[in-house]
Swiss-Prot record:
Belongs to the ATPase gamma chain family. Keywords: ATP synthesis, Cell membrane, CF(1), Hydrogen ion transport, Ion transport, Membrane, Transport. The gene is atpG. Produces ATP from ADP in the presence of a proton gradient across the membrane. The gamma chain is believed to be important in regulating ATPase activity and the flow of protons through the CF(0) complex. This is ATP synthase gamma chain. SUPFAM superfamilies: ATP synthase (F1-ATPase), gamma subunit (SSF52943). Pfam families: ATP-synt (PF00231). It comes from Ureaplasma urealyticum serovar 10 (strain ATCC 33699 / Western). Gene3D superfamilies: 3.40.1380.10, ATP synthase, gamma subunit, helix hairpin domain (1.10.287.80). One of its GO terms (cellular component) is proton-transporting ATP synthase complex. GO terms for biological process: proton motive force-driven plasma membrane ATP synthesis.
Length: 286
C-alpha cells in the first residue's frame, strides 16, 4: 500500500470519527432533554395510576370492560426508533416481538424501524403504522390519538387485549424491553398497598358522577394515552442512550484505527527515507 493511499485512509477515518462524535453529542443533548421531560411527568403519571387504582378498587366488577364474543387475539403497540445507528436498541425490541406475537395478533407500529421489521417478517397483521418518532412528534396528543384507535378495536371486539412493547430505561448502559398489559385492567398492578386506607375511605365518602362504571369508561382513552406517553418517552430515552453509547464506541474505534494507520504510515515513510539515504550513500561511493 502506498503512502498516499494510507494518508487517504487516515483522513477518511478521522472524518468518520468527527461525524460519530457529533452524533454522540447530539444524542447526549437529546437524552438530557428527554430525561427532563420524563422527570416532569413522572409525578403526574404516578398520581394518575393511584387514582385509577383507587377507582378500580371500588368498582366491584370490571367484567363490563370485557367485550362479549371478542376475537381471541391481542393488539400490540410496539415502539421502535425512526433512525438507525442505535446499537442493539431496535434488535432487542424486534426480538421480543418475534417471540411473543402470534400471526393472528394485530400490531400498531411506532417508528420506521419497527415498520420495516414487520414488513420484512411478512407474517404479522399490521393495522396502523406511525413512521415518525422524532422529538417534535412525541406529544400527548399523538398518544391520545393512538389510544382512541386502539380502544376502538377493543370496543368492536376485534381484539380482547391491548399491550405495549417498549424499552424501559434503567441506567445509561442498561435497558430492558418490556411487554405491559394495558387492557383489561390489572388490579394487582394499579392498586398499591399504600392506598388501602384511602380506598376504605373512598368506598363511603367519595361520590362518583355519573357512576363508577361510566367514569371508568370515560377515562379509558386518557388512561391508555398516559401509559403510552410514558412508554414513548422512556423508549426515546433508551434509544438516545443506546445511540450515544454506540457512537462513543464508534468514535473510540475510529480514533484507534487512525492511530494504527499513522503507525503504518510512519513505518513505511521511515523505511522509504532509509532506502533513499542508502541509495545516496551507495551512489557517492561509486
Amino acid at each position: 500500500m502506498s503512502l498516499d493511499a494510507i494518508k487517504r485512509k487516515i483522513s477518511s477515518v478521522q472524518t468518520t470519527a468527527k461525524i460519530t462524535n457529533a452524533m454522540k453529542l447530539v444524542a447526549t443533548a437529546k437524552l438530557k432533554r428527554q430525561r427532563d421531560r420524563l422527570a416532569a411527568i413522572k409525578e403526574y403519571c404516578h398520581d394518575y395510576y393511584d387514582v385509577i387504582g383507587l377507582l378500580l378498587s371500588v368498582v366491584n366488577d370490571i367484567e363490563f370492560l370485557k367485550i362479549p364474543n371478542a376475537k381471541n387475539r391481542t393488539l400490540y403497540i410496539t415502539i421502535n426508533s425512526t433512525m438507525g445507528l442505535a446499537g442493539s436498541y431496535n434488535y432487542n425490541v424486534n426480538k421480543l416481538v418475534s417471540k411473543i406475537i402470534n400471526e393472528d395478533d394485530i400490531t400498531f407500529t411506532i417508528g420506521k424501524k419497527g415498520h420495516d421489521f414487520m414488513r420484512l417478517s411478512n407474517r404479522l397483521h399490521q393495522v396502523n403504522t406511525y413512521l415518525n418518532l422524532n422529538d417534535n412528534d412525541l406529544t400527548f396528543d399523538m398518544s391520545l390519538q393512538i389510544a382512541r384507535e386502539a380502544l376502538e378495536l377493543y370496543s368492536n371486539g376485534e381484539v380482547n387485549k391491548i399491550c405495549i412493547i417498549y424499552t424501559k430505561f434503567i441506567n445509561a448502559i442498561t435497558f430492558e424491553v418490556n411487554n405491559i398489559d394495558v387492557l383489561p385492567f390489572d388490579k394487582t398492578v394499579l392498586t398499591k398497598d399504600n392506598l388501602a386506607e384511602t380506598i376504605e375511605l373512598a368506598k363511603d365518602n367519595i361520590i362518583f358522577q355519573p357512576n363508577k362504571v361510566e367514569l371508568v369508561k370515560k377515562i379509558l382513552p386518557t388512561y391508555i394515552a398516559t401509559v403510552l406517553y410514558g412508554s414513548l418517552i422512556e423508549s426515546k430515552i433508551s434509544e438516545n442512550a443506546s445511540r450515544r453509547n454506540a457512537m462513543d464506541a464508534a468514535t473510540k474505534n475510529a480514533k484507534a484505527l487512525a492511530e494504527d494507520y499513522k503507525l503504518i504510515y510512519n513505518t513505511l515513510r521511515q523505511g522509504k527515507i532509509t532506502r533513499e539515504i542508502t541509495e545516496i550513500v551507495a551512489g557517492s561511493d561509486d
